Amino acid sequence: MDTPSPDPLPSPLPGEEEKPLALSPPVPRGRRGRRPGGATSSNRTLKASLPRKRGRPPKSGQEPPLVQVQGVTAPVGSSGGSDLLLIDDQGVPYTVSEGSAAGPEGSGPRKAPHFCPVCLRAFPYLSDLERHSISHSELKPHQCKVCGKTFKRSSHLRRHCNIHAGLRPFRCPLCPRRFREAGELAHHHRVHSGERPYQCPICRLRFTEANTLRRHAKRKHPEAMGVPLCAPDPGSEPPWDEEGIPATAGAEEEEETEGKGEPA
């Protein structure tokens, strides 16, 4: 059986010329198939229309929101006073002065510090204040499983566990000695550098450690235990001379020498 042949293409009419098909140029696309100026611009517009976080002063022309704090309702940034009642990210209200809340022009409000009620130390974030409050607490929740000793912080427990494990991770680069803590290594460096930052104000001897200076003062100068051991004080007793040595030092030795006298 013969297969029918396809119909031939119609020939152009006389007087007409064949023209190529006109294709539109491809539309450029951004990354991930986004058209430039399309979804990105709409996202930016959407973000700009979203409300800002709590704690920022309202724009001019808008009524400030009301905040309920201990039964007292006060508008944030009200013109009745120079203080601003704000709320941080944790939902805790705090009051700052209008001058301190506004930072440099165009930088927005500056976060007010949180003060420790015990030592009045200031912290920029509430989490830092909560971490600091552990030092004033008597609780020691971290306990060593070997000896049962308790600690306030987990870092102190990890450092203590190095004693039972025999680990000394801090090694001196100048000698083979190793230490459990970085502070011990820093003190050991004074042996190689010759640094003696602690000086006796009476005999002017210098020491590497503060404990060594205290032992020296108890043994050599028991009568001057009330004298400051770090630096001479011109207003303290006994009086200090220009070199920082007590003016009465050595007076008893001179009296003993004069009392004996030379043999006749």
UniProtKB/Swiss-Prot annotation:
Span list, region Disordered: 1-75, 225-264
GO cellular component, one term: nucleus
Pfam families per record: zf-C2H2, zf-C2H2_4, zf-C2H2_6
GO-annotated biological processes: regulation of transcription by RNA polymerase II
An MF annotation (GO) of this entry: RNA polymerase II cis-regulatory region sequence-specific DNA binding
DNA-binding region listed in the record: 51-63
Zn-finger segments (C2H2-type): 114-136, 142-164, 170-192, 198-221
Subcellular location: Nucleus
Biased composition (Pro residues): 1-13
Keyword Metal-binding: yes
Nucleus keyword on record: yes
Keywords annotated in UniProt: DNA-binding, Metal-binding, Nucleus, Repeat, Transcription, Transcription regulation, Zinc, Zinc-finger
InterPro entries listed in its UniProt record: Znf_C2H2_sf (IPR036236), Znf_C2H2_type (IPR013087)
Function: May be involved in transcriptional regulation.
Family per record: Belongs to the krueppel C2H2-type zinc-finger protein family.
The protein's name in its UniProt record: Zinc finger protein 524
Record organism: Homo sapiens
Gene: ZNF524
